[in-house]
Amino acid sequence: MLIKILVISNNIYILKKSTMKVFYLFAAVLLVFSCKTETPVKEISIKEDVYFLADDSQEGRETGSETEKQSANYLAERFKNMGLAPKGTDGYLQPFTFKPKTNPHGKATYNINKEDSTITGLNVVAYIDNKAENTVIIGAHYDHLGFGNEGSLYRGEGAEIHNGADDNASGVAVMMNLAKRLKGKNTNNNYLFISFSGEEMGLLGSNYFVKNPTIDTKKVNYMINMDMVGRLKDDKSLAVYGVGTSPKFSQTLFANNSDFKLIEKESGVGPSDHTSFYLADMPVLHFFTGQHEDYHKPSDDAEKLNYEGMDAISTYILDIITDLDNDGRLAFRKTKNESEETPDFKVTLGVVPDYLYDDKGMRIDGVSEERPAQRAGMIKGDVVIKVGEYEITDMMSYMKSLSKFEKGQKTIVIVERNGVPLALEVTW
């Protein structure tokens, strides 16, 4: 197989795919020579970022892997070369540790005790400091499924690299493009850019950042997330989630749209990293071009993406940010959860579990409006320890307990609130 070497600020990256012709000039321009005059840094396109991240050499960017570290270092160098300041806990990096924990969703659970941890993920965090009062967070997860493992929809024999071009090299590349375009512009806000890891295992990186922020989250204006924005179709359908999380969003989306068939979703809860910020009472917008047959399969490759569409999405998001730049701090508004997964059971409490919780029970990270949990009086932070006669020790036992009930039945759910047990009557 043809091998290519990419050098960025003296870091060497090995590229394996024979389709990587776009990087010949890229590597030559970014090679840093040890001489008095530094070689100018070439601007990297959305396509070039995708082709790097989705190359076979990155082996699917699985959280905790050596190639995840390589991808993280690449992104850190990209931020550095654009002149963004580091805002992690270790330069541009924010490590977090966790141990895998099997449950019906194939997620993992964060473990705050490092001595018991088995895996370390890396968020990559960079900052544009405009000396403004508020900060806009712009994020996209860069991890994927590695060679498949849990979460893969591939049914072939043997392990194959899942490159995750759309999911989510596309979102990261658009985020990088926005970082370049926002440098020195729209200075009424600061901008924090985060490449999350651990999304595929249960929003681990974003959840960790929200609970261990490197900026004052009370000064966060709003958060924009991009996950799978690389497959814009001919009808230009673009889904935007979280539109109801601030009164300003709907009109702003409409006023700046001339190209897209917008599919607006009110809810701030969904299967991507914006959820972590919404649950911390921050307005969020999440952009998504839709599902496709290559989702979570080895066939999600870079050559299948719509790069003109990604450029257009980047411009649209920039226009939205520009429009909101003079509006000050946006108001936050809670929404109904429109995106609950259809479970294998007939009833659900209507809560968002805290997948990072590693103690006894199931801790609630969010409560959906007008659902059984809210009607019964449950709140964020409650720990469910018993459902009817069934003891809840972890996520698995919680899921199993739900299969024992029918819609319309009533039962007592015991929760711990600030260490005090409470018995609440739930109507399913």
List each language-model region with its residue ranges.
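N-terminal capping segment at the start of a domain
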Residues: 41-70, 82-90, 222-231, 293-300
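A non-catalytic alpha/beta surface segment that caps or lines the substrate-entry region
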Residues: 61-127
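Alpha-helical metal-binding/catalytic segments enriched in His/Glu/Asp
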Residues: 126, 138-139, 149-202, 317
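Metal-dependent peptidase/peptidase-like ectodomains
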Residues: 196-286, 306
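His/Asp/Glu-rich mid-to-C-terminal helical/loop segments that flank catalytic regions of hydrolases
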Residues: 293-339
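PDZ/PDZ-like groove recognition
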Residues: 336-380
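Conserved PDZ fold ligand-binding element
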Residues: 375-395
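PDZ-domain C-terminal substructure recognizer with occasional recognition of PDZ-binding tails
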Residues: 400-428
